[in-house]
Each structure stands twice: as structure tokens, then as C-alpha cells.
């Protein structure tokens, strides 16, 4: 699993935020567009793209895009 691809998939969920402004260190909850609807979209994206379970608690316990990636990557590796 590649963090650059994860960041691109994450950035695609935002309509008005420039994808170039999103990096591994981005504190996603501070993005102007961040909302509960985007959080649900993240959960759906992870399920569709990576075929692993991802919950609201995972998002609540994360601060950066890299935190999200690490959770997803660990689950992908565990299921491999």
C-alpha cells in the first residue's frame, strides 16, 4: 500500500480543497471542508479501495492523514 495513492484517494473526497494542499502531515479535521459527511466518505473509500473495516472511532482517534493511512495499512497487512 502506497501513502501517495492513499493521499490522492483522500484528496479526491473534497470538492473545493486543492489536492496539492493535502499531505501526510495535514491535520484533516482542520480542513475547511471537513464534515461528518466527508468522514463517512472516508470510511466508504477505505472499504471500497482497500477492502478493510474502518470506523468512526478510527477517524476520531486520528489527527493527520498519515494517522489514517497507518491504521488502514496495518489492517491491509494483517489481512494479507
Residue ranges of predicted features:
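Phosphopantetheine-dependent thiolation modules in NRPS/PKS and related acyl-activating systems
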Residues: 1-43, 48-80
Amino acid at each position: 500500500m502506497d501513502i501517495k495513492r492513499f493521499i490522492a484517494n483522500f484528496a479526491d473526497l473534497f470538492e473545493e480543497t486543492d489536492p496539492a494542499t493535502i499531505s501526510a502531515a495535514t491535520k484533516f479535521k482542520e480542513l475547511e471542508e471537513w464534515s461528518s459527511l466527508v468522514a463517512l466518505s472516508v470510511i466508504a473509500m477505505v472499504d471500497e479501495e482497500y477492502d478493510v473495516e474502518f470506523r468512526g472511532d478510527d477517524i476520531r482517534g486520528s489527527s493527520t492523514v498519515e494517522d489514517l493511512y497507518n491504521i488502514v495499512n496495518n489492517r491491509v497487512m494483517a489481512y494479507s
